[in-house]
């Protein structure tokens, strides 16, 4: 992309509960990926002239986590702390992408079934604080389907804060059949913290939680047959792996490796009364018209960081096959880049010529106010 073009290119910003993915429309991967964290010092600054800040965002907060209290402004996909969120957006535009937001149309993403007020406030901040010329809010799962090159399918988008099943037919999301599950990566991290405590390793602070998240991402996997895997783990050490903590101490984990993500299939592990992701997928398909179910079964698209566990696609295939009619053809699509497929879908959408009339312009916002977002963005 030449510099001449970059002056009006749309910005795509996928604000996840765990990671912000941002970059320019038309690129094939996000330029900036950093944790959605704002950190504030826990202690009084004593060294004068150190240039200490009262808050840190993203990677800088992550690297100084030992002296900070870390907060995530987005919980379960819903922005709960708007001041911190503004800091994150400011950091995205000015420090990561190094652009002036008033020159770029901006595409944001959100989870389906989010409160309406959440969208309006996002719209308001974009136009009033950052003065963007135009903006749009897209549903995350729909973008993932775009990225996989399909217009029909059922997406299981599981991130850090929220998971959802969205059936889409010929490009239309079917709102009555959307299933939302407030069980995602962060809950799995918390559960892993808990079961590691049973092994005698204690992780408590917000900084230590980040270590556990790293253990989860590096060592966890989904068992094809949970009971059988538990038996294997009990009778041999073949499933044990070691992990070195930042202070050099080495810990060993065994059945925790697959007990942690098993929660996705058995939410009762963390005391949730909900159905597992395989059942929510099936229920969501069953709420759709009988004529389109076949197409949905054949196009199960996984997206989001919490679908990155090895073995998850095979397990989904097995579980959904068990629930579906016996002759049904079932296909699970798990693209290797699914961690970023929401962003990639946004990049595709924002660079389509047909999309250009879909933007909410500053002028429309000034005339109608924040509620315009419900009229223009499905």
UniProtKB/Swiss-Prot annotation:
Keywords: ATP-binding, Cytoplasm, Cytoskeleton, Hydrolase, Muscle protein, Nucleotide-binding. InterPro entries: Actin (IPR004000), Actin/actin-like_CS (IPR020902), Actin_CS (IPR004001), ATPase_NBD (IPR043129). GO terms for molecular function: ATP binding; hydrolase activity. It catalyses: ATP + H2O = ADP + phosphate + H(+). It is an enzyme of class 3 (hydrolase). One of its GO terms (cellular component) is cytoplasm. Its EC number is 3.6.4.-. SMART domains: ACTIN. It is found in: Cytoplasm, Cytoskeleton. Actins are highly conserved proteins that are involved in various types of cell motility and are ubiquitously expressed in all eukaryotic cells. Multiple isoforms are involved in various cellular functions such as cytoskeleton structure, cell mobility, chromosome movement and muscle contraction. Belongs to the actin family. PANTHER family: ACTIN. This is Actin, muscle 2/4/4A. It comes from Halocynthia roretzi.
